[in-house]
Amino acid sequence: MHCKVSLLDDTVYECVVEKHAKGQDLLKRVCEHLNLLEEDYFGLAIWDNATSKTWLDSAKEIKKQVRGVPWNFTFNVKFYPPDPAQLTEDITRYYLCLQLRQDIVSGRLPCSFATLALLGSYTIQSELGDYDPELHGADYVSDFKLAPNQTKELEEKVMELHKSYRSMTPAQADLEFLENAKKLSMYGVDLHKAKDLEGVDIILGVCSSGLLVYKEKLRINRFPWPKVLKISYKRSSFFIKIRPGEQEQYESTIGFKLPSYRAAKKLWKVCVEHHTFFRLTSTDTIPKSKFLALGSKFRYSGRTQAQTRQASALIDRPAPHFERTASKRASRSLDGAAAVEPADRTPRPTSAPAIAPSPAAEGGVPGAPVKKAQKETVQVEVKQEEAPPEDAEPEPSEAWKKKRERLDGENIYIRHSNLMLEDLDKSQEEIKKHHASISELKKNFMESVPEPRPSEWDKRLSTHSPFRTLNINGQIPTGEGPPLVKTQTVTISDTANAVKSEIPTKDVPIVHTETKTITYEAAQTDDSNGDLDPGVLLTAQTITSETTSSTTTTQITKTVKGGISETRIEKRIVITGDADIDHDQVLVQAIKEAKEQHPDMSVTKVVVHQETEISEE
């Protein structure tokens, strides 16, 4: 049978397949023609009309799914990857970009003016390379279709952004395009028209994260896959069973009305495929039964995203050559890190988790019990105490120098408590290595603490403070105000709940605590009463940011105490995850970020607290 497939680059691929060929046979031939190895994200679509399509089932014969001849299909992205950077090959990302360009132009992926200009500039950079005034005319952007309603203002903005790019390769431009496109609310959403039980027109959207409900182009509800227990359809009705919430006792079923039985079945199949591909680690098959069975036997027969990533990791071939059709530029993909991590990408924000969240908790069947929950708390306190700058400071006497040397001593207190001699989870060698790494980390941290330097804000605040007194010449008296006090405390605690022993009624914890305190004190003058002054609070500010796996709370307080301005910054980072976390790496990262953000301040206190919960099997 003769087949005709419209590709994403507006070309047509024609071939002849056997009469009993299945959908996977044709898809495999198309991917071989395009030199695509990561083919599981793509599929072949049959278009009923201009807005409605049906995916070709890979496991069934083509002739049973197509009405009449000719056999016309389109090659499209079926499963939009949540993180395109994890795709192995640049050619896969390029075809994903082509699909997203079609989605934008057709209006399926709405964008703001600023986003359209940014994505359009990356499209031009990918197709044409760096701006060259000798090659590119005054309106070279008008040759590209970048938006549904493309205006001259948009083209001028695209040209302005494109001219600012220097030495950005096509692969880097594609990756930047995808990094911005994946943040759009309608990215990868498959839309289906429906009605609610009251007959109000709505649209149901299926994506990698779950089922979305839209009304008048606004999202009014969301059902993530972990909360969906069952998906079913009956005649033209579509039902989802929702897991009960914390305050609920029973499961709830929500129904929707679709235009026809065929539309309800198509929506059900799309939901099953998306749930299986993005949530499960492997596909399951229905065992063949000799008796008549009720219900649909449809199951997603392809590979899941987890299996696709495993297969992609085994790809061992040179980066393939492919032609960018818009400009007819032969492009060779970048190798390795240059494509995945371009040099001009912005660094990870400070509030982002230092450890990537593990997909283990998201994988699997919805409702599967989580066997291990782990919470990591890293608390970093940055404190700066500084004396006001003085114009004329007298040289200290020899007695004062000796007294200060005597007082600048080290007081170290180490308390060790081990309530259990035998660890049920770790060997003694592992415990010794862990403790040695913590001790080495503390030692390196204590040696690398920089001297605090006054910031410009505190200098101005101290100079104009109403609590400071000036003499006749306008100079600050040297005897007034308390001297500089430096304090530094490091506390690291490691607590784990051991697996239950043979006595079922009692849990014996393993507690290991080490405390190290180093204090530097300067001499106090007799007439100084700065410690009795509680100080005056100038400002207090709390900033909280959240990501999918961490919460960062930053509290900034500024006080004036006896003519001394004090700035205290306390940052609390709570990281939750279901995988083993490198505690030392988290601590090093937190200290490093605190020093980079506030180079003129010193870290005085670091507290690491770990909570591990192990449920009964």
Swiss-Prot record:
The modification Phosphotyrosine is found at Y13, Y413. The modification Phosphoserine is found at S312, S331, S333, S417, S427, S437, S462, S465. Pfam families: 4_1_CTD (PF05902), FA (PF08736), FERM_C (PF09380), FERM_M (PF00373), FERM_N (PF09379), SAB (PF04382). Residues 467-617 are annotated as: C-terminal (CTD). Disulfide bonds: none annotated. Coiled coil: none annotated. GO terms for cellular component: basolateral plasma membrane; cell cortex; cytoskeleton; nucleus; plasma membrane. The modification Phosphothreonine is found at T169, T489, T612. Residues 401-466 are annotated as: Spectrin--actin-binding. InterPro entries: Band_4.1_C, Band_41_domain, EPB4.1_FERM_F1, Ez/rad/moesin-like, FA, FERM/acyl-CoA-bd_prot_sf, FERM_2, FERM_central. GO terms for molecular function: actin binding; calmodulin binding; structural molecule activity. SMART domains: B41, FA, FERM_C. Phosphorylated at multiple sites by different protein kinases and each phosphorylation event selectively modulates the protein's functions. Phosphorylation on Tyr-413 reduces the ability of 4.1 to promote the assembly of the spectrin/actin/4.1 ternary complex. Keywords: Actin-binding, Calmodulin-binding, Cell cycle, Cell division, Cytoplasm, Cytoskeleton, Mitosis, Nucleus, Phosphoprotein, Transport. The keyword Cell division applies. It is found in: Nucleus; Cytoplasm, Cytoskeleton; Cytoplasm, Cell cortex. Residues 387-396 have a biased composition (Acidic residues). Residues 1-282 form the FERM domain. One of its GO terms (biological process) is actomyosin structure organization. Residues 308-401 are annotated as: Disordered. Its main location: nucleus. Binds with a high affinity to glycophorin and with lower affinity to band III protein. Associates with the nuclear mitotic apparatus. Binds calmodulin, CPAP and DLG1. Also found to associate with contractile apparatus and tight junctions. Interacts with NUMA1; this interaction is negatively regulated by CDK1 during metaphase and promotes anaphase-specific localization of NUMA1 in symmetrically dividing cells. Interacts with ATP2B1; regulates small intestinal calcium absorption through regulation of membrane expression of ATP2B1. Protein 4.1 is a major structural element of the erythrocyte membrane skeleton. It plays a key role in regulating membrane physical properties of mechanical stability and deformability by stabilizing spectrin-actin interaction. Recruits DLG1 to membranes. Required for dynein-dynactin complex and NUMA1 recruitment at the mitotic cell cortex during anaphase. This is Protein 4.1. It comes from Bos taurus (Bovine). The gene is EPB41.
